[in-house]
């Protein structure tokens, strides 16, 4: 994946970090889905879609140059993500409700997703406010190939997300509280779990 050849300015650095952060968030989501077998609910899938839209905005900035329409994609994706995360928070706000899925540092992932979407919007606001300041970080000497790799990882995660969503939901409506993949038999799921467990043990 080709990116614009330019010195690493503060604005470009924020775009690079934004794309990397979204990749990390998607990797964590897939870890809990594949390793801990916590399938995403429909609202969770919409939150992932919002993050992917925001990620495309960052990716387009790095590949085709800084554009207002790219930042618009980031903001729209972040707003969609934030709205969906807020909706899920409201669904589990009643006393005694343990929430959906695992907690991370005391907060559920949809709460972290809301925080992330707000931080992304703030980052874009900072970028737009200082976009006229072209301060180069030449001393950082960041290899552009590193962020080409991040771009390819992002596209791979999108493909994996699409495949897993089709397997989970099939051709119809996604289950509100999914516990299995509609397009996979029990034998297929057992085989995948065994393979993932074996790979995890071998890495350890």
List the predicted regions and their residue ranges.
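Secretory/periplasmic and organellar redox-cofactor proteins
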Residues: 1-40, 51-57, 67-204
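Cys/His-rich metal-chelating microdomains
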Residues: 47
């Amino acid at each position: 994946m080709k990116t614009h050849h330019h010195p690493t300015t503060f604005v470009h650095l924020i775009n690079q970090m934004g794309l990397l952060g979204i990749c990390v968030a998607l990797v964590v989501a897939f870890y809990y889905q594949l390793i801990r077998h916590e399938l995403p609910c429909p609202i969770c899938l919409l939150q992932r879609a919002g993050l992917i839209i925001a990620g495309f905005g960052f990716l387009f900035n790095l590949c085709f140059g800084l554009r207002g329409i790219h930042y618009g994609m980031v903001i729209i994706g972040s707003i969609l993500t934030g709205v969906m995360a807020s909706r899920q928070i409201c669904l589990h706000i009643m006393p005694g409700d343990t929430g959906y899925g695992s907690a991370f540092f005391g907060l559920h992932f949809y709460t972290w997703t809301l925080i992330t979407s707000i931080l992304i919007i703030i980052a874009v606001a900072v970028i737009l406010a200082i976009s006229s300041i072209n301060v180069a970080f030449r001393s950082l000497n960041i290899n552009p190939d590193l962020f080409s790799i991040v771009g390819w990882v992002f596209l791979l995660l999108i493909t994996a997300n699409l495949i897993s969503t089709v397997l989970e939901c099939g051709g119809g409506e996604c289950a509100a509280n999914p516990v299995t993949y509609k397009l996979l038999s029990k034998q297929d799921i057992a085989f995948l779990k065994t393979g993932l467990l074996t790979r995890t043990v071998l890495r350890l």
